[in-house]
Amino acid sequence: MIHQPPAGARDLLPLEVAQKGWINDCLQQVFQRWGYQRIVTSTIEWLDTLMAGGAIERSTVIQLQDTSEGTLGLRPELTASIARTAVSRMADSTYPQRICYRANVFRNPPPGYHGRQLEFYQAGVELLFAGGLLADGEILLLVADCLETLGLTDWHLILGEAGLTRSLLSVFPDPLRQQVRHCLAHLDYITLENLTYPSADLRERALLLFDLRGNPADVLSKVASLELEESDRIIVNNFKSLIHLIEQSHPNPLPLILDLSLVQTFDYYTGLVFKVVSSSDNQLRVLGQGGRYDQLLGLYHPQHQSAPGIGFSLNLEDLHLCLLSTSSSGMPRQIPVIDWLVIAQTTQSQVAAFNYAQLLRNSNTLVRVALDLGGRSPEEIRDYARTCRIKTLVWIGEDGTPRIETVQ
């Protein structure tokens, strides 16, 4: 089996690398324009770090061999690792920390899905030690800026509120509450409808939660009709203020959907949660996800001091697939071509060929220069150049004199 990658792994060839590199570069430029600094965390972490106090299922983590000090794992996402880093290396900061990243993550597939992809690529940001309306608004507007910079148009921003959803779920007894939550997280209406409920009222409440999605004003009107605690009414009012803020702060109407049944797979979120979805090419893709996690940093603090945080990650694979079907995108459709091919015509001119190629490479602008490695006739070299879209050949004669030829 050494001639194949393991199940769930895949190789990226030059064109895909160039395209995903372009996506990453665009996103990093947007992050930097908003004042975010890149961080690099370890791919390998202690399993306890990665599980974020139980918010991330142990089965999700690809685990490595136990050591004498504990079990290691490959990160299934970046937020927990960045939270650990922030608490251990940036804990003295009382001002907001704006952090961005581009990295790979690893996840075990669900049971029964052998062969599903294990390694994923993400780019994202974390806004740490900052809470409140302005921080939430900054993150949502930054998401929109990222998607617009990439040239994507057919997308929606789905908003939810983890605290309010937990409150609405609190009427269900355990373990039914976990079953309802799982159905909401995976949009499994059939299973939700057929769960065993202690009363018809609870069944009706579960189905109502599933349907709390749509135009923000309409959904908030439905929620207002429910019997809510005072703390929940404050959340609803804050949500109204947030939606007003981002709608007034963006030059064009944002494609917002309010979905109070939205439950993220990772359970460390405490406030605003959101997903970015696209329906291009008649396929629904999740382009990104994020939310507020005001208790997570406290898990890694020696005195368990909490600090607010909010962030998001964008999924490079899904962004790439959407951009492939978007003709207006600036993503490259071909690998960069070689600008110059330098050919030593004799053994005596090989040193001169290397020197001339290096002279071309020393240009102030990026110039791609390759050296012909011999063994081909002049016509075979020209055929190769046409196939590879090489525009210019440089023939180095025996005396070291270059002769430039434009390929027709």
UniProtKB/Swiss-Prot annotation:
Major subcellular site: cytoplasm
Name this protein carries in UniProt: ATP phosphoribosyltransferase regulatory subunit
Cell compartment(s), UniProt: Cytoplasm
HAMAP family: HisZ
Pfam families cross-referenced by the UniProt entry: tRNA-synt_His
CC terms in the record's Gene Ontology section: cytoplasm
A molecular function GO annotation: histidine-tRNA ligase activity
Recorded family membership: Belongs to the class-II aminoacyl-tRNA synthetase family. HisZ subfamily.
Other noteworthy facts: This function is generally fulfilled by the C-terminal part of HisG, which is missing in some bacteria such as this one.
Subunit-level organization: Heteromultimer composed of HisG and HisZ subunits.
Pathway connected to this protein: Amino-acid biosynthesis; L-histidine biosynthesis; L-histidine from 5-phospho-alpha-D-ribose 1-diphosphate: step 1/9
Protein's organism: Gloeothece citriformis (strain PCC 7424) (Cyanothece sp. (strain PCC 7424))
CDD domains assigned to the protein according to its UniProt record, in alphabetical order: HisRS-like_core
Keywords, ordered alphabetically: Amino-acid biosynthesis, Cytoplasm, Histidine biosynthesis
Function: Required for the first step of histidine biosynthesis. May allow the feedback regulation of ATP phosphoribosyltransferase activity by histidine.
Biological process according to GO: histidyl-tRNA aminoacylation; L-histidine biosynthetic process
PANTHER family hit by this protein: HISTIDINE--TRNA LIGASE, MITOCHONDRIAL-RELATED, HISTIDYL-TRNA SYNTHETASE
